[in-house]
């Protein structure tokens, strides 16, 4: 059967659990094994440890380690009695024994260790009996054992008279008792012999041991270490060895002589005392009686001294023998007079025993403490930091207190919730875990030091050393404290309240009054504390940082104080914060920075607007939040499934479906409805995806769209009014300025899809159209916009709205109307039905290639890559109807053709038609390849004044194409065309005049450059100035688009290569530029050469004619001299003799 006493394995414990129904775990088994290792008893039920010696209860091994202090058990006499002696000795029979005296003369003795029946006769044959010996007898004589009883032979008895038998029986009883006593004595001697033998090593160890006092006051032997004992043994052996070599023979000394002569007392003669010839003093010596005190008088003295100490709170010191002393003072705690002893932890020492009070001095301390609140009962909650050293009555303390071994309890601190006695010995670990209850001043400095070291900066790059004097540091710290706070005591609450109630100005005045004196004091007495001086100067600067310019504040408030619009509202708030000066909080300063940021944004946006709508910074992100449609959220207009209720609007919607929608027959398939055609292109619907494939691969393939070419962000994507962008009438871009392209739109049946931003909203078609599928006829997809407006029309006005839309709007719009006309029609309808201004539009896609708007219906779109119009409501769409709107999309067809779109007049700049473009060699369908022929046209017109005049009149912006080549620009400058353009267009078109001025300036800079690379860099740098002029011209023409494209290409090329050029790299385009320059210069290079030849011929002919005319007028006799003079003048003018007219030429001219 399993028991817990023989539980050596875990399975034993589990077997015990099964038999007895207990629930002991492995933790119990581990604690049981730990108890066996340290010699403790483990209580399985209470889960505690019990000491077998002191019977103390402990809950953990840590408590045993910290608090268990009992000694090992002392030896007992029973420990030295063998197991054989522990057995009960046989009790001899004290009845009558008949002893037969043999004839042998040897003395017979009795053996009482043999258990023999009473009637048997015991016989011994030996000389003596040795009691209490378990070894062989020392005598050599054999011991004759008692013969075994013979059952067959009858016992021999001797009949005697009755009285002698009784007397002999009494004598034998006495002898038996005496023998038993001797046996007991022998056993006791044997036990003590074993005890002496076992204690011999222990007693020998005590010869070298010292006596020490334990914590409980008991005196114990403290043995020396093994190395000390070995050292003493060697020393004793050495002394014994020397004694053996020189043995000492004792002798009696009966006479002492000095050098063999007589003693000094015999040889010295007695001298007579000298006579003092002075008058003896008449002063009588006072002999004080020696004070002798008994125990009663000493007790009274201690009581009186204790009363004085406690009442006056004086310090005292009780001194004992040698260096024993106890220091303390009288104090009060909660109105009770107590004795406070000086402990070690108050001096900064953490020791196991905080204070040692000798036994002889403890009674005196107790008597002094008894003169105060000795009989007051104390609880642990009444003791707190600052109570260190308080002497309490051990019998009058209640609560969580540690071990109490003496009549007095000296407070030390708290650990694990218990108050510890300073006289108790604790472990080294507890000394560091204990919260010492030292006094307040010590706590202050301990807290200061701890916090100072804890908050030491972690980014110090050097090793700190003690360079300043500690006393000087304390002095400077006191100066700083008094300068900033000016307290009578740092613990004074009234000073703190008075300081708190000071206003900001009063506090600044109070600190300013003292800070100058403190700075001077530190400069003179502590000049090494330069960091403190910098801090004080900074404090002084902050306190005096006041803004007294109230005049400017009032003037600003007067000028724009009533303006609530931006940026004036930000200026007003910033003005209110700045006037506060140093009274402004950090939050207000942060708000001031935000106001400055808003002002900076305003001026930045204003600057960008001044730049005439540059596309570089154009951003038109779509809102991430879906538009709230109140009509679709009103519970009164929703059915039980949350769908929109058309009501009477459903009946009147037939006017749209009957005339402008085509019914789809699904039985014939959707193939003929897939392509949505318009006069200038087509778009592929996603209606075919209504046939859903359950195969994942096929379905994923049906979700892939067919993208078109992206034209990028151009001026076609934006709309402006007054030079500012009208964002609802622009294409949507991402946060980087790239146009957002449309994705595939999946189809649905019997729905009206609303929402141009965010997630689409699906509205069920009217009940009259239920079960049928409708698609708008070609050219009438804008009817979906009117159908979306019908959702917000009240039911009683639905008839008027549909009639007006059909008879007025649709009748005038017809097929493929322009966006301007559609917006105008929406504005007319919204004027009579204002609720439709907030109507949500279907998604509208922009196709810049075909100049078309696509209004997406419920059948979606397979074709992707279109731009998205941002307009989401009717109010935003109506902006396209404004005449002041500058937008190409304003004239796009809603499913129309670009050639039919009306164009605005170009003002002073004429617009080229199709025929004119063909005459110039330009193809309007591909503008990318039209730069070269127009540039060739410009090159031809450089030295042809009439062609140049015609070119400047029709397409003046072709001059900007000259920046492609430095040679072309220089030729254009030298021909005077730029000067002519500046003067002709100065009054009519200042933009063209400014363009010519910029080209002239670039030509001058190019002429100074020595290499083609530098010349191209100059032209690319000047492209930005030309782009600013081309941003918003008065009209549109082909030359403008070509010039704009050329300038943007050069700017993009410069920006792309800027980083490479800055770091020293060169691009491979330099060689390409040389080839292009040769190619372009070839056109006008031959022309220049021909002009040079013609100029040479004309010059020579003119000189010859002039020379002949002069020769004919001169004297014939001096013709030879005149000829030489002409040659000399030609050499002087041309610096070349071959250019001077020759004599033959003169002669021929004379002959002619």
Swiss-Prot record:
EC number(s) recorded for this UniProt protein: 3.4.21.-, 3.4.22.45
Entry similarity comment: Belongs to the potyviridae P3N-PIPO polyprotein family.
Residue window of motif Involved in virions binding and aphid transmission: 747-749
Site (Cleavage): 437-438, 895-896
PROSITE patterns documented for this protein: HC_PRO_CPD, PV_P1_PRO
Origin: domain of life: Viruses
One family name in Pfam for this protein: Potyvirid-P3
Keyword Protease carried by entry: yes
Source organism per UniProt: Lettuce mosaic virus (strain E)
Keyword presence, Transport: yes
A GO molecular function held by the record: cysteine-type endopeptidase activity
GO biological process: one example: symbiont-mediated suppression of host innate immune response
Entry GO CC: host cell plasmodesma
Database matches in InterPro entries: HC-pro (IPR001456), HC_PRO_CPD_dom (IPR031159), HC_PRO_CPD_sf (IPR042308), Pept_S30_P1_potyvir (IPR002540), Potyvirid-P3 (IPR039560)
Name this polypeptide is given: P3N-PIPO polyprotein
Keywords of this entry: Host cell junction, Host-virus interaction, Hydrolase, Inhibition of host innate immune response by virus, Protease, Serine protease, Suppressor of RNA silencing, Transport, Viral immunoevasion, Viral movement protein
